[in-house]
Structures are given as structure tokens and as C-alpha cells.
């Protein structure tokens, strides 16, 4: 049992290290995440990014170099790398954090860049979005500014399911700017309720209005949405 636990911990640690390495190397390619799957002939590595060509490189040169690094330094056996476009990049916090960092490095004003980031996220259907930019923004003294739109949950059971959070770093002449992007995904949260009214007859022949409250909950078995109703 101890050996099994150690095996899974090592796999998780390797994935975290690979993820951090790829995020550092390919943030300009809007790196979004990685999947590592062990196969009978080696290791399948699927990289998601907003701009896949920057990771692939000319003639696949960058991919070949990356495969050597993953095998030599991270112990991945015969890595087969696939680079694919991130699905809904505007709803991926890591992609948007890297985009914001790149915009700041190009000279965009932090407030304008953060506002554009918020608008793009909300235009893609997000329930809420929050952007925090910190550093020497307007003076020699470090501070931060926060922009928020919609609903952004800070705690609760559903936090890991509907909240995506990421950070990025922009290197500027005044110093290092830190950016944080938080996105509430376009899914129903467990605190949503629906009120349904219906008219029923009483024993005396009168009419009464009954309100049913439906709590919208996540169906864990099917991954869908189910209603648990009570009066």
C-alpha cells in the first residue's frame, strides 16, 4: 500500500514539475495546461495552448528539443508530444493571465489591459471575472488594483468546480508586475434556486397558491444537473 501511494505521489509531482516548466518556457504561446498519459510504447504528452505554432516551432524543432528535455530531466519514457489549441481560451485563467502579462510587457497601460481582459472573459459567457495587477503601477511604491465584473466566489464547496485561477508575471523597467486572473465558469452554482408557483383547490372549494422551491444541484453520478424540490 505504501509503495502504491508513493507511486501516485511521484506521478503527481512529475506532472506538477512539467506543468511549471512548460508554463515558464511557453507563456508567450499562451500555455494552458498539459496531460501526461502512460502508454505501452512510451508516454503521451498533450500540451494545450492558445498559440500552438509557437510551441511546435519551425519544422517541429522546438518539439524535438522539448522531448529530449522531458526524457532527460523529468524521466518521461519515450515522450510523444502533441500540441493542440486550448478549448475556449478566453475562459482559461492561465491563458488570459499570460495574455495580460504579454500586453503589459508590450507597453499597454495596466488599467486598459485589465479592462480588455475582463471584457473578453465576460463576452465568452463567464459568470464572473476578477483581474488583479500589482507592482509599481503609478509611483515608486508598490500597490495593486483590482477589476471585477459579475459573480466571483471566494469560498465554498463549489470553489474548485466552477472557479479557475491563474497568475502571471510581466517584466518591466520599473520592476516586476504580478497579474492574477480569476474566472467563474459558465455553469450553474449550487446556490441557484427557481421559484415555481401553481394554484391548487382547497377542500372548501377555494384556491391557494403554492410555491415550490427547486434547488439546482450537481448530479455527481452523471455529471448533469438535477432538481431537488420541496414546498
UniProtKB/Swiss-Prot annotation:
Question: Where does the KH type-2 domain start and stop, copy by copy?
Answer: 18-97
List each coiled-coil range.
none
Keywords for this entry?
Answer: Ribonucleoprotein, Ribosomal protein, RNA-binding, rRNA-binding
- Stated role: Binds the lower part of the 30S subunit head.
PANTHER family in the record: 30S/40S RIBOSOMAL PROTEIN S3, SMALL RIBOSOMAL SUBUNIT PROTEIN US3
Q: Which HAMAP family match?
A: Ribosomal_uS3_A (MF_01309_A)
Name-wise, this protein is: Small ribosomal subunit protein uS3
